[in-house]
Design a protein with these regions (language model features):
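Conserved loop-alpha-helix segment in the C-terminal half of the alpha/beta-hydrolase fold
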Residues: 45-83, 88, 93
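Hydrophobic "lid"/C-terminal helical patch
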Residues: 30, 94, 98, 102
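Conserved alpha/beta-hydrolase catalytic His-Asp/Glu region
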Residues: 1-47
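Generic helix-packing signal
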Residues: 33-34, 70, 86, 98
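Generic structural signal for alpha-helix termini and adjacent loop/cap motifs
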Residues: 36, 104-105
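A generic structural signal for secondary-structure junctions
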Residues: 1, 19, 71-74, 103
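Residue-level signature of transmembrane alpha-helix interfaces in integral membrane proteins
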Residues: 38, 65, 71, 97-100
């Protein structure tokens, strides 16, 4: 709720994208996300270092559930203040986490 008042420009940009996207495209994208196969095995077998950035207030995918999955496949994770779009909601922290990760690889 707080982000709705502090991020009005970013929210308006997302709304503009949504209202200009044809309904068929929105439905297809939603179904694609819902029906996509589990690709966890791809991450499990990838030998490169991996990082998953999670939003602490994500209402769609609880970070606790994702943290357990990420740890089970040997990935690094960062839990930041923000929701499902944490990279928009907490851009500065996201950039800092990415910079630190890039220094490791």
């Amino acid at each position: 709720e707080e982000n709705r008042t502090t991020m009005t420009a970013a929210l308006q940009q997302l709304i503009n994208i949504g209202v200009t996207t044809p309904n068929e495209g929105i439905v297809a994208a939603s179904l694609g996300m819902k029906e996509r196969p589990d690709r966890t095995s791809v991450l499990q077998h990838l030998s490169a270092k991996k990082l998953f950035i999670l939003g602490k207030e994500d209402a769609l995918i609880p970070y606790q559930k994702m943290t357990a999955l990420v740890e089970s496949i040997g990935m690094q994770s960062a839990v930041l203040e923000g929701g499902h779009l944490v990279y928009i909601e907490n851009e500065a922290a996201t950039i800092e986490v990415l910079r630190n990760f890039m220094k490791q690889i």
